[in-house]
Amino acid sequence: MTLQQKELFQKSPLLLENGETLSPVLVGYETYGTLSASRDNCILLEHALTGTAHAAKHFESDAPGWWDDYIGPGKTIDTDKYFLVCTNVFGGCSGTTGPSSINPKTGEPFRLQFPGFSIKDIIKVQRELLEQLGVTRIVSVIGGSMGGMQATEWAIDYADITDSIINIASPLAAGPDAIGYNLIMRMAILNDPDFNGGNYVGQPEGGLATARMVGMMTYRTSELFSKRFERFTVAESSPAAFSKEHFQIESYLQYQGDTFVERFDANSYLYLTKAIDLFDVTAPAKDDLPAFAKIKIPYLLIGITTDQLFRIHDLRRGYELLKEWDVPVTYHEVASEYGHDAFLVEKEVPKFEPLIRSFLSNLPVKSI
């Protein structure tokens, strides 16, 4: 079974955190394994900023997924045991309603008329989908990077049906480094003449590619770049040519930018990075307590010491805050030359897999 879609919020519109409403909402998702008769063996997997619902292959000739090494019979997320659901996030561009979707009121794409939204709104859509799928309990919500933010929000908003959380490389609030990088990336898009106020034809390729190049510099480490590229040059290149890549690192970044514009929408990039910036569960809720104080379920937090996007001191601070408020948190750190993206890299599976497998296997009996 590959990408499926469901239309939600047809009778009652989606009420967003900012008070705006939207109806209907189309959600793209993929599932792995079988929902049990008791409907309580679900694991919800959250993708990162530019990921998709295609987390793993469904058959041998299928396109690779972004977490193939963790998903399947006998693997960490054992599909003989669990029913795994992975959605394309609300506001994205891979099968779920977002800025590039058609506005039913105008017959034209929403573009920048799409309502602003938060991480909380993203998981509200997921909650509605799981209800439509018949899921009554979730064994664990697992996510890395922006996916970890979604997982954390699940522990706050829907702890009544969620048994545990696994958050990889995501703080309790976006730090100034991440906010600053996101601003630079958005400005690259907004200042591209082809952006045209969001009403572009095709893509604002230069701006979006530049944004991706900036992002790639935060997803990996200087150690990895030094080892892979040093100051190696591209054959037959001219050091005086500004329009051509002279160094191999330039060629690598240009390739990352060029391929990215073929698969991701610039407006979605603006909205999603802003949602990341605004994520902050340390802020007081209506009861004047920090939002994360509501978390009472087992919570696995994994920090990456070499992370250049979400710095390890922010993860450590998050762990201390969770402990102070008696959240049942387990914390581990992983070192990797791959930095923030380490949890997505096949070579690094042995560092993360035992931590995730052990956490899932040690959940209370009711959760498995």
UniProtKB/Swiss-Prot annotation:
Q: Provide one Gene Ontology cellular component.
A: cytoplasm
The family this protein is said to belong to:
Belongs to the AB hydrolase superfamily. MetX family.
Name of the protein in its database record? Homoserine O-acetyltransferase
Name all AB hydrolase-1 domain ranges.
Answer: 43-346
The gene behind this protein is: metXA
For the ligand (substrate), the binding residues are: R212, D341
Which species does this protein come from? Answer: Listeria monocytogenes serotype 4b (strain F2365)
- NCBIfam families for this protein: homoserO_Ac_trn (TIGR01392), PRK00175.1 (NF001209)
Sorted alphabetically, the keyword list is: Acyltransferase, Amino-acid biosynthesis, Cytoplasm, Methionine biosynthesis, Transferase
